[in-house]
Amino acid sequence: MKNHIKYLFGSCMLAFCCLAMSAGEVVSEGLHFETNESAGTASTTWAIFPLIRTGAPACASTYPSEFSKCYYERSDNYVNLGALSVPEVVNHCAVTAIGRYSFHNSGITSLVLGKNVTTIGEGAFIWNDSLSAITFPEGLTTIGDEAFRYCKSLTEVNLPASVQELGYGSFANCSKLERFTTSSGLKTIHSSAFELCEKLTTLNIGESVEAIDGGAFIACDALSTINIDPANTHFTFANGNLVNTDSKKLVFVAHNVEKCIIPEGVKEIANCAIFYNPSITSLVIPASVENYEITAIAHCDNLTEVHCRATEPTVFSELNSKMWEEVASHCTLYVPKGSLARYQAAPIWKNFAAIKEEVLSTVDDITATPRPADSNVYTIDGRLVKQNASSLSDLPPGIYIHQGQKVTQ
């Protein structure tokens, strides 16, 4: 009798939802779609049958969908879809988009998207912590904000060539993700895209990537290898420093670097570039740095010394008034000889526990601590000149950094 009542309740709720649908809304294979027949397109909105099957209300009032008359339940046991395949066509309309929060916390274990999908909306697959495999269609262009956040079973992601943009937090908190390869067409990686991907060790950046926002790799403690396509002229990665060469901006410092030497020529330090970095103990800032974005350097508990090469202290905006607040109390600031009084009087800078002068030499004070296995050769300003080098004999005379040591050729 109880089962009959449950079935009757589910049938009634399904009927209610179907009555609530507009003419452009259809249900196919347990998935709810919004169709635009004049344009010949459709997008998923949410899953309906699994809600009834698991006993959750089909039209609960706790969380609205994109459509005013339909709602879905936000709970720890939302649905249990398992293997999900989104169809290519429904009701003669090509499925081109996955709507916002369509499959939020839906118990998906594997995902195959139909070949017509071009856009994955905000939060579309967030909190599917059993999702371990994704097949992306070749025509996909956009992955929205937090689309795969908290998909904790993903270990590797390879994007198709068509993807152009990774939204804010798109793969954040994917705690088992180890390797990520950007598509050959990817242009932009937004802030927090890989935040708290604690096991991410390797990132392969393709030729087309033009912009990486500050904070894209917050708390990626294992990220030590960023391979940049030789044809990419927008970024360099050397000695743990990821630099946008177009804007002269430091984007990220790897968390396996103890002594960070920001390359000469960098003009700006991006938001969260050196952020929650437990390894860094010493930081060298070249005189070329003119601007620090908000929270550019923060929460570095083991940072004990900062060497600032600029003779004039940088003036911080009101928005950046808390710069150095997290580290000043336990840090010594070293400044060029003759500039001590200026730093002691300068707002923000004067908050350091101790400020000392030092005499700068041209080369002798330059050292580096890249990742232990680094066999690449760099110039003293951080430019990569030779990869996987066993010898420097074919390089022109000069001073280089090889395997963490200064070498004169």
Regions found by a protein language model. Give the residues of each.
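C-terminal outer-membrane/trafficking sorting elements
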Residues: L360-Q409
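Structural signature of tandem-repeat unit edges
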Residues: F49, V79-T96, S106-T119, D129-T142, ...
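A short, structured beta-strand/loop element
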Residues: A42-Y78, G82-L84
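Bacterial N-terminal signal peptides
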Residues: G10-A20
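A recurrent domain-boundary module in secreted/ectodomain proteins
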Residues: A345-T362
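Bacterial N-terminal signal peptides that target proteins for export
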Residues: M1-C12
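Consensus positions within tandem repeat domains that build extended binding/scaffold surfaces
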Residues: G99-S102, G121-A124, G144-A147, G167-S170, ...
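Boundary at the C-terminal end of the N-terminal hydrophobic targeting segment
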Residues: A20-S28
